From Swiss-Prot:
<protein>
    <recommendedName>
        <fullName>Transmembrane protein 256</fullName>
    </recommendedName>
</protein>
<feature type="topological domain" description="Extracellular">
    <location>
        <begin position="30"/>
        <end position="63"/>
    </location>
</feature>
<keyword id="KW-0472">Membrane</keyword>
<comment type="similarity">
    <text>Belongs to the TMEM256 family.</text>
</comment>
<dbReference type="Pfam" id="PF04241">
    <property type="entry name" value="DUF423"/>
</dbReference>
<feature type="transmembrane region" description="Helical">
    <location>
        <begin position="64"/>
        <end position="84"/>
    </location>
</feature>
<keyword id="KW-0732">Signal</keyword>
<feature type="transmembrane region" description="Helical">
    <location>
        <begin position="93"/>
        <end position="113"/>
    </location>
</feature>
<dbReference type="GO" id="GO:0016020">
    <property type="term" value="C:membrane"/>
</dbReference>
<dbReference type="InterPro" id="IPR006696">
    <property type="entry name" value="DUF423"/>
</dbReference>
<keyword id="KW-0812">Transmembrane</keyword>
<feature type="topological domain" description="Cytoplasmic">
    <location>
        <begin position="85"/>
        <end position="92"/>
    </location>
</feature>
<keyword id="KW-0007">Acetylation</keyword>
<feature type="modified residue" description="N6-acetyllysine">
    <location>
        <position position="43"/>
    </location>
</feature>
<feature type="signal peptide">
    <location>
        <begin position="1"/>
        <end position="29"/>
    </location>
</feature>
<keyword id="KW-1133">Transmembrane helix</keyword>
Amino acid sequence: MAGPGAAFRRLGALSGAGALGLASYGAHGAQFPDAYGKELFDKTNKHHFLHSLALLAVPLCRKPLWAGLLLASGTTLFCTTFYYQALSGDPSFQNLAPVGGSLLLLGWLALAL
C-alpha cells in the first residue's frame, strides 16, 4: 500500500511497538511516585495502543495526510504529557494534554472524511 498514508502505517506499527515496550517497562521496571502514577501510566498506555491502531487505518481514508498528522501529533502530545507526569509526579505539563486530546479528536474525524 503506497501513497501518502503508507508512512503513517509504518509509524503506527512503530508506535504500537513503543507502546508495548512502555507497557513492559510500566509492569516490570518503573518506579512510580505513588499509586496514582501507576494508574495514570496504565491509562495512558491504553490510549497509546488505541491510537497506534488508528494510525494503521490512515492509508484507508480519503485524507491520509490530515488524519495521519493529527493522530500522530495528538498521540505524541497527549501520551508524552501523561507518561511524564506518571513517572515523575510532576503535573506542570498537564495543560498540554487537552491540546493533544483535541488533535486526536480531529484525527478521528479526519479518518471519517
